[in-house]
C-alpha cells in the first residue's frame, strides 16, 4: 500500500498464456484464469523468449536435446541449433528484468524455452525423458534464485 492505494504485485509471464499469438505456429495458449481472474490482482510483465530472441512467427518447432546440465535448443525438422542466440538473448533479458521488481514468474509448462521443469529432453538416440528445463527458464531461475 502506497498513499492509500494498493499496488499490484508484478509477475513475469509467458506471453502466450495471455492469449497473444506468439507460438511457433502462430497460435497461443490462453489461460483464462491467469488473464481474467488473477490478472485483476497482479500486473503482468509478458515475455516470449522465441519472438523476443528474433525467431519469428511462424517458426519451426524446437526441442531440447543432449546433456541435462547444458541442453541444446534445436529445431525439430531441420536440426538447426538455436542455443547460442537464445542464451545470448536470455542473459540480456534477465538483466533487463532486474528493474521490473518482479515477485515471481509464470512459465509455460513443457516449453523448450520457458518450461520450468520436466521438459522433454532428447538423448543421442532421440529418446525423450521429462528431465529438462527450458533454456530461458533455467537462466532466469539461476539469475533470480528463491
Describe the predicted segments one by one:
Residues 18-26:
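Short N-terminal binding/cap micro-motifs at the start of the first secondary-structure element
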Residues 49-69:
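Short, surface-exposed acidic-centric catalytic microdomains
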Residues 78-99:
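Glycine-rich anion/phosphate-binding loops
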Residues 93-146:
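Internal, conserved structured core segments that host functional sites
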Amino acid at each position: 500500500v502506497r498513499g492509500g492505494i494498493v499496488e499490484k504485485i508484478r509477475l513475469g509471464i509467458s506471453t502466450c498464456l495471455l492469449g497473444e499469438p506468439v507460438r511457433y505456429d502462430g497460435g497461443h495458449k490462453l489461460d483464462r484464469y491467469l488473464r481474467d481472474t488473477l490478472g485483476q490482482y497482479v500486473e503482468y510483465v509478458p515475455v516470449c523468449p522465441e519472438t523476443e530472441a528474433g525467431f519469428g512467427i511462424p517458426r519451426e518447432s524446437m526441442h531440447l536435446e543432449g546433456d541435462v546440465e547444458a541442453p541444446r535448443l534445436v529445431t525439430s525438422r531441420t536440426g538447426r541449433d538455436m542455443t547460442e542466440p537464445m542464451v545470448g538473448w536470455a542473459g540480456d533479458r534477465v538483466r533487463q528484468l532486474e528493474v521490473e521488481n518482479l515477485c515471481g514468474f509464470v512459465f509455460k509448462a513443457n516449453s523448450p524455452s520457458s518450461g520450468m521443469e520436466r521438459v522433454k529432453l532428447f538423448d543421442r538416440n532421440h529418446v525423450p525423458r521429462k528431465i529438462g528445463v527450458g533454456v530461458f527458464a533455467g537462466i532466469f531461475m539461476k539469475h533470480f534464485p528463491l
